[in-house]
Amino acid sequence: ASLKKSLFLVLFLGLVSLSICEEEKRENEDEENQEDDEQSEMRRGLWSKIKEAAKTAGKMAMGFVNDMVGEQ
């Protein structure tokens, strides 16, 4: 009977430990996904700024070329 109780206790503690590990694993995965989302958002913001800068530079270059062509 005591062997049965000991075995039950070991199995119970093992399941509790496994459950805690699974919960921590899920939390870590959620944190990683959130970090990935934040990095993606930062990249999108950076790319939009780069595109805006490129548009502005292109407009300025076209204006400069038009001015140079107009002077000749």
UniProtKB/Swiss-Prot annotation:
One of its GO terms (cellular component) is other organism cell membrane. It is found in: Secreted; Target cell membrane. Keywords: Amphibian defense peptide, Antibiotic, Antimicrobial, Cleavage on pair of basic residues, Fungicide, Immunity, Innate immunity, Membrane, Secreted, Signal, Target cell membrane, Target membrane. Residues 1-21 form the signal peptide. Pfam families: DD_K (PF12121), FSAP_sig_propep (PF03032). InterPro entries: Dermaseptin_dom, Frog_antimicrobial_propeptide, FSAP. Residues 29-39 have a biased composition (Acidic residues). Expressed by the skin glands. Its main location: secreted. Residues 22-44 form a propeptide. GO terms for biological process: defense response to bacterium; defense response to fungus; innate immune response; killing of cells of another organism. Antibacterial peptide with activity against Gram-positive and Gram-negative bacteria. May also be active against fungi. Belongs to the frog skin active peptide (FSAP) family. Dermaseptin subfamily. This is Dermaseptin-S12. It comes from Phyllomedusa sauvagei (Sauvage's leaf frog).
